[in-house]
């Protein structure tokens, strides 16, 4: 049983957290005790809870630019006595820099460093530090990476390019459909940059179709095609990036989840 702290209104989402397809993917691919789960976009620790519930002995390394969310996640780790956890109060990008995180609420899960994706949408800003993964954590053995950064996927992946090539982890990554007509071309261009980078790393792309917290189906694709946002978009905006040398094993395990609808 996980203890959920409430701090200045934060914590409710963790209290109502339900099992979903990501839990099953973690069970299949991330239970490697001598390697690390990298969580890019910790927010208030939703994936931290999922991971530590399933893999209590495996190391966890999280990155989160929102200082309020980091303070909450540290408290979550403390009250539950989660072992082997490090949270870096920084964004991941292509290098060390000072960036602006736009948000509306203190723990806004939609907060983004890419302001052009949601023009004039956010009400608040926070100056944050960014760093590239490779410079600081290249030697760290990775088994699995989760990326949820509201548009900053390319910078995250580019900044950990050498680590991805060396350690060959699986990557679950959200790539959102275009939230406004005016930014559809911009959003597609950024998604295409991600695809080109993955291709250069010898990685394949699988689009996941999820519904009601379950994995319904999946499709091996060459390109991520961005559409205008609809109510169905959340069911098709999650992807699995994987080394092509592991393709047969990855496809076989994913098929087992679809068969069981986990």
Which sequence ranges carry the predicted segments?
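S-adenosyl-L-methionine
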Residues: 1-132, 138, ...
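Short internal loop-to-helix segment that lines adenine-nucleotide cofactor pockets
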Residues: 13-38, 98-100, 114-167, 179-186
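Hydrophobic pocket-lining residues within nucleotide cofactor-binding pockets
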Residues: 42, 92-94, 133, 149, ...
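Conserved S-adenosyl-L-methionine
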Residues: 88-90, 203-212
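Short alpha-helix
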Residues: 130, 188-201
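Conserved beta-strand signature within the Rossmann-like core of class I S-adenosyl-L-methionine
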Residues: 168-176
């Amino acid at each position: 049983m996980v203890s959920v702290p409430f701090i200045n209104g934060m914590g409710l989402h963790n209290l109502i957290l339900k099992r979903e397809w990501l839990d099953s993917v973690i069970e299949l691919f991330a239970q490697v005790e001598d390697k690390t789960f990298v969580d890019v976009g910790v927010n208030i620790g939703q994936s931290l809870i999922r991971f530590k519930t399933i893999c209590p002995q495996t190391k966890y390394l999280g990155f989160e630019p929102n200082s309020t969310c980091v303070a909450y996640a540290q408290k979550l780790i403390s009250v539950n006595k989660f072992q082997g956890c490090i949270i870096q109060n920084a964004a991941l990008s292509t290098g060390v820099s000072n960036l602006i995180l736009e948000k509306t609420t203190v723990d806004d899960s939609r907060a983004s460093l890419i302001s052009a994706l949601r023009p004039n949408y956010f009400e608040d800003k926070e100056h944050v530090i960014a760093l590239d993964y490779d410079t600081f954590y290249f030697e760290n053995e990775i088994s699995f990476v989760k990326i949820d950064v509201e548009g900053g996927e390319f910078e995250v992946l580019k900044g950990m390019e050498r680590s991805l090539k060396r350690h060959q982890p699986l990557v679950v990554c959200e790539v959102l459909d275009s939230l406004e007509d005016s930014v559809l071309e911009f959003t597609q261009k950024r998604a295409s940059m991600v695809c080109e980078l993955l291709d250069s790393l010898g990685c394949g792309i699988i689009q996941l179709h999820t519904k009601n917290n379950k994995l319904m189906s999946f499709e091996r694709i060459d390109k991520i095609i961005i559409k205008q946002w609809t109510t169905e978009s959340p069911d098709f905006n999650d992807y699995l990036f994987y080394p092509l040398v592991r393709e047969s094993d990855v496809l076989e395990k994913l098929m087992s989840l679809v068969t069981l609808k986990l």
